[in-house]
Curated annotation (Swiss-Prot):
Start and end residues of each stretch annotated as C-LIP: 624-830
Protein name in the entry: Phosphatidate phosphatase LPIN1
Sequence positions bearing Phosphoserine: 106, 150, 252, 254, 260, 294, 434, 438, 449, 600-601, 887, 889
Example of a GO MF term: transcription coactivator activity
Sites bearing Phosphothreonine, chain numbering: 264
Length: 890
């Protein structure tokens, strides 16, 4: 009985450790990378598939992934996306290249640079606004009574305690937080709360509209994308943080957070993470639903606004005249807390009139300040709740919210079935706009969720303003002050629409100045297609429509020299979201934006001047996109050695310290011969038990396979292990391959290629559907292309299913060198299926099936062809005299 008890205890401990390894909160993995040296010396690599689990990236430092190769740090860094995936940021200056929205991102900045940039922006805003930097930027709603304050105070034990010292926040970006570690399923009231808070609660504005002069209300209406988006297969992320400063916590494999289908208005598509690509949402199976909520049917131009406002048809209290708070409002200490303060148009123009005003207002408040609370007749959970952490997603649903809720408020959040004005219709109108949020601050990765949307270009549109300052055809440059002095207000334009015919009219789009003839097609493209025109098209229109500046032949020469001089300096990006069309990024820092206000067609292509902080601003034609591959120069900088190179990807976190993800980079030559080997059912005896029994310590390996693979590798062949397992099982699978030991003989080293998809998706595809060829064909084809000009790098392959045979045939493996094995250990050669063998028998004739590869630069003997057994012991040829031949012919 003691023996049985010890055995049961050992099994329990083993299963417990296995569960910890598969825990969705800690599941991370890295797929090995293959680097191929080309004949000309260039290097090509397979994609860097790295994924961190949720606990590993909780409150990470700037979402930057550090890389160590062979124990030494390298200068390259990766960035962390919302799905936990790591990717490189590639700079591109191609005007014609259109970057998809799910691939657009912001540059990676060092901690010191981003901190300096934050201080620079805050200092500039404080000087212009005349505010104390330590003033907390939060608004207290008039409806906040002592009872609501007590409720908020009661919840602070399980929620983040916001600090009031903004200077201390900027010095220490990692705030102390005490909150729930895992999200709970959201109910509709919680979803509505986050939906409304991210939209800055437009329905609560009308009660204050009568108290504020209309001429002071010229607010930009910004609607951040508030609907949820997928993170990994069959999972959905919480709504983005209202502040937009950081995206929510990356979900991990096998975690499922359900959302209401009424809130999204359509069935949630799954996330697809294919080989060599970044995760992105699968296309909807019902496209007609998307058409019902087309952005063209519900979009209006908001009065007093430079932005397009998206109105819900069910919101009867929201009108065109309703101003909306942008990110938050400022609290004047000299006025009662019950008075709501707004940001007027004059202040916004002073701040630079950049396109997304949300990040500018964000700089006026601490990064983790409480969410803006607005007034309403009754208190609701969405009004009393503090803003959650920037990293954590959906909060739990608390019972006191349901019991204390007013019946009228409950009717708003829990509509009856069939109510056309309920939450379902409200969400369906905006369901088509479900997308990832744009990065709202330096180093943020809000755009990194990998979700495409019908409104990708909507939030990228720059600000628009008009003025009668003139100067486009004169010899003077348009300044900000001159533009603001003659700025045209909304009321002036209503009274006199013929202003567009005034020759002094100047249209400011983003940071550029145009006449009306040039600006008209630009504005039409923004309104009709929600995306700006490409830079090449804009330049063509400007050449035809913009007035020529005659008599200034020296100016273009000076601008050309200035451009060359500035482009020769090392580029260092400060802030901003990458624009695929090459337009001026609207989210540059405030100081940088003031520096490079260009006004003429001759100055359009001139680079921006450096700011006083010593940084070079983002060039107008430079954009940034995600990539999983490195260039040849970047690969050479890694200083890889031939064969395996240990690589460690690490993310610094506040609570867990440093989360590390280990892998291997293999440097091979273009003429190497590769042997492909499956794992489940090929090295192990069966598929399902091959996942479980080795973890419990049971040897479930085919007999003789380790010796066979070892002898084949000694003949000069490289091994590649390809399995349809998920990336989260990389460490477990890699450990199993190292654990296999057959009387002192181990498996040869080789790259481990796994599916980048989630755990359950990969298990379902391989074990249930039994269709691993979906992944294998795509993966092996990509690896094959790295060996070009060698079109047949794969010499032989081992598998256990007809699907494996199909995959190997697709990548050019010869049929007579494809071997399949069954659970009994019977090895079959595909071109002669009646000839049944085994790993042990094949090992006896390994030199005939896998002959020794002889190459002058890799052989043990430099002259192996001269000093081999045959050439050394053979009899010399007898001398041959050709004199008789010449005499006979004569």
């Amino acid at each position: 009985m003691n023996y049985v008890g010890q055995l049961a205890g050992q099994v329990f401990v083993t299963v417990k450790e296995l569960y910890k390894g598969l825990n969705p909160a800690t599941l991370s993995g890295c797929i090995d990378i293959i680097v191929i040296r080309q004949p000309n010396g260039n290097l090509q690599c397979s994609p860097f598939h790295v994924r961190f689990g949720k606990m590993g990236v909780l409150r990470s430092r700037e979402k930057v992934v550090d890389i160590e190769i062979n124990g030494e740090s390298v200068d390259l860094h990766m960035k962390l996306g919302d799905n936990g995936e790591a990717f490189f940021v590639q700079e591109t200056d191609n005007d014609q290249e259109v970057i998809p929205m799910h691939l657009a991102t912001s540059p990676i900045l060092s901690e010191g640079a981003s901190r300096m940039e934050c201080q620079l922006k805050r200092g500039s805003v404080d000087r212009m606004r005349g505010l104390d930097p330590s003033t907390p930027a939060q608004v207290i709603a008039p409806s906040e009574t002592p009872s609501s304050s007590s409720v908020v105070k009661k919840r602070r034990k399980r929620r983040r305690k916001s600090q009031l010292d903004s200077l201390k926040r900027d010095d220490n970006m990692n705030t102390s937080e005490d909150e729930d570690m895992f999200p709970i399923e959201m109910s509709s009231d919680e979803a509505m709360e986050l939906l409304e808070s991210s939209r800055t609660l437009p329905n609560d504005i009308p009660p204050f509209q009568d108290d504020i002069p209309e001429e002071n209300l010229s607010l930009a209406v910004i609607y951040p994308q508030s609907a949820s988006y997928p993170n990994s297969d069959r999972e959905w992320s919480p709504t983005p943080s209202p502040s937009g400063s950081r995206p929510s916590t990356p979900k991990s494999d096998s975690e499922l957070v359900s959302k209401s289908t009424e809130r999204t208005g359509q069935k949630n598509p799954e996330m697809l993470w294919l080989w060599g690509e970044l995760p992105q949402a699968a296309k909807s199976s019902s496209p007609h639903k998307m058409k019902e909520s087309s952005p063209l049917s519900s979009r209006k131009i908001c009065d007093k606004s430079h932005f397009q406002a998206i109105h819900s048809e069910s919101s009867d209290t929201f009108s065109d005249q309703s101003p909306t708070l942008v990110g938050g409002a400022l609290l004047d200490q000299n006025k009662p807390q019950t008075e709501m303060q707004f940001v007027n148009e004059e202040d916004l123009e002073t701040l630079g009139a950049a396109a997304p005003l949300l990040p500018m207002i964000e700089e006026l408040k601490p990064p983790s300040a409480s969410v803006v609370q607005t007034a309403n007749k009754t208190d609701s959970p969405s009004r009393k709740r503090d803003k959650r952490s920037r990293h954590l997603g959906a909060d739990g649903v608390y019972l006191d919210d349901l019991t204390d809720m007013d019946p009228e408020v409950a009717a708003l959040y829990f509509p009856k079935n069939g109510d056309p004005s309920g939450l379902a219709k409200h969400a369906s109108d905006n369901g088509a706009r479900s997308a990832n949020q744009s990065p709202q601050s330096v180093g943020s990765s809000g755009v990194d969720s990998g979700v495409e949307s019908t409104s990708d270009g909507l939030r990228d549109l720059p600000s628009i303003a008009i003025s009668l300052c003139g100067g486009l055809s004169d010899h003077r440059e348009i300044t900000k002050d001159a533009f603001l002095e003659q700025a045209v207000s909304y009321q002036q334009f209503v009274d006199n629409p013929a202003i567009i015919d005034d020759p002094n009219l100047v249209v400011k789009i983003g940071s550029k100045y145009y006449n009306w003839t040039t600006a008209a097609p630009l504005l039409l493209a923004m309104q009709a297609f929600q995306k700006p025109l490409p830079k090449a098209t804009v330049e063509s229109i400007m050449r035809d429509k913009m007035p020529k500046k005659g008599g200034r032949w020296w100016f273009s020469w000076r601008g050309r020299n200035t451009t060359i001089k500035e482009e020769s300096k090392p580029e260092q990006c400060l802030a901003g979201k990458a624009h695929s069309t090459g337009e001026q990024p609207p989210q540059l820092s405030l100081a940088t934006r003031v520096k490079h206000e260009s006004s003429s067609s001759d100055e359009e292509r001139a680079a921006a001047k450096p700011s006083n902080a010593g940084h070079l601003p983002l060039l107008p034609n430079v954009s940034y996109k995600k990539t999983l591959r490195l260039t040849s120069e970047q690969l050479k900088s890694l200083k890889l050695k031939n064969g395996p190179n240990d690589v460690v990807f690490s993310v610094t976190t506040q609570y867990q310290g440093t989360c590390r993800c280990e892998g291997t980079i293999y440097l091979w030559n273009w003429d190497d011969k590769v042997i492909i080997s499956d794992i489940d059912g090929t090295i192990t005896r069966s598929d399902t038990l091959g996942h479980i029994l080795p973890t419990l310590g049971k040897d479930w390996t085919h007999q003789g396979i380790a010796k066979l693979y070892h002898k084949v590798s000694q003949n000069g062949y490289k091994f590649l292990y390809c399995s349809a397992r998920a990336i989260g099982m990389a460490d477990m699978t890699r450990g199993y391959l190292h654990w296999v030991n057959e009387r002192g003989t181990v498996l040869p080293q080789g790259p481990l290629l796994l599916s980048p998809s989630s755990l359950f998706s990969a298990l379902h595809r391989e074990v249930i559907e039994k269709k691993p060829e979906k992944f294998k064909v795509q993966c092996l084809t990509d690896i094959k292309n790295l060996f070009f000009p060698n079109t047949e790098p794969f010499y032989a392959a081992f598998g256990n299913r007809p699907a494996d045979v199909y995959s190997y045939k697709q990548v050019g493996v010869s049929l007579n060198r494809i071997f399949t094995v069954n659970p009994k250990g019977e090895l079959v050669q595909e071109h002669a299926k009646t000839n049944i063998s085994s790993y042990v028998r094949l090992c006896e004739v390994v030199d005939h099936v896998f002959p020794l590869l002889k190459r002058s630069h890799s052989s043990d003997f430099p002259c192996s062809d001269t000093f081999s057994n045959f050439t050394f012991w053979r009899e010399p040829l007898p001398p041959f005299e050709n004199q008789d031949i010449h005499s006979a012919s004569a």
